[in-house]
Structure formats: structure tokens, C-alpha cells
Amino acid sequence: MFSKPIFVAEVALSHDGSVGNACALIELAKKYNVDIVKFQDHWARYESSNQEKFRINIGLDKTRYDYWKRTEFTIEQWNYIYKFAKKLNIRLGFSIFSEQSFHRQIKLGNKIWKIGSGELLNEELIEIMLQNLGMEDTVIFSIGLSDFASGLRICKKFSNVVKK
């Protein structure tokens, strides 16, 4: 277990699809002694379609697919970001939203995961994570506006798989 508070910088998609912005945000987090920089790894073609509209439009993107496509990184770009973070001795963590994003982050060596309230009920993704994570992985749960009992039930499932 952790013996001191862990500070996480929630970058999510604030990089706006720019590797340079992502690296600048990692540098800023390092400057303020953040322990983990947490991104979202969306992969548009597995998580959306051109027909999926925004609840509230953001910027010039017409659909959620357009937004995620514009802000997603390739495995090569993520690899560059990982190497950049490693040079600064800062850890990365990820929220993932599809099996494909999960396996991409596994290939890159990710060991820190956040399951947000929107994914707590994604039983398929939860099962894939339970089958593939190990004692060296850390899972952060954000129950948010979800039913607390449901969130606790999911957390207990992971307690047999991961150490932290």
C-alpha cells in the first residue's frame, strides 16, 4: 500500500490531440511534484460512430467520433509520451474505454489504471481487466455519481487481482 498521499494530475484529453501539449503537461506536473499523470486513451473507431452526437457541442467537432479521432494518439505517439515521462521520472496512468485501448496500454507497459464511474457498469471491459491485470498493477476507482454499492462490488472484485 501507499505510505504517503499520491498526487495525480488529471490530464484526460487536455492535450487536445497534441503530443507536444501532452509532454508540456507532464513537465508542468513534474514541476509541481505530481506523482502520476493520468490520461484518457480513447480510440474513436472502437468507441463511437459518425452518427453519435454530442450532448453538448464542444468546439468545431460535429460528433463525439470527430472529437475522439482528433484527440487520439497512435501507439507510436503514446510510446514517445511514455519515454518522455520516463526521462522525467514521472509515472503515467490511464482511463481506458475499450478493450483495444486497454490492450494497447498493456503493450506499452502501463501499470496504473483508473476506472471512472461511467465504466463501472461496463461489465465486458471490467472482465477483460480482471483477466489481464496482476499484482503489480494499481487500480484507482472513481465512483462519481454511480451507485455506491455497485462501485464497492466492483472494487472488491479487483482486490483479489491487484495489490494496490
Where are these regions (language model features)?
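Active-site-adjacent beta->alpha loops and helix N-cap segments on the catalytic face
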Residues: 18-19, 49-50, 74-78, 101-102, ...
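Conserved, mostly hydrophobic/aromatic
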Residues: 10, 29, 105
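N-terminal small/glycine-rich loop or linker at the start of catalytic domains
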Residues: 1-14, 50, 79-80
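Glycine-rich, proline-tolerant flexible connector loops at the mouths of alpha/beta enzymes
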Residues: 35-72, 117
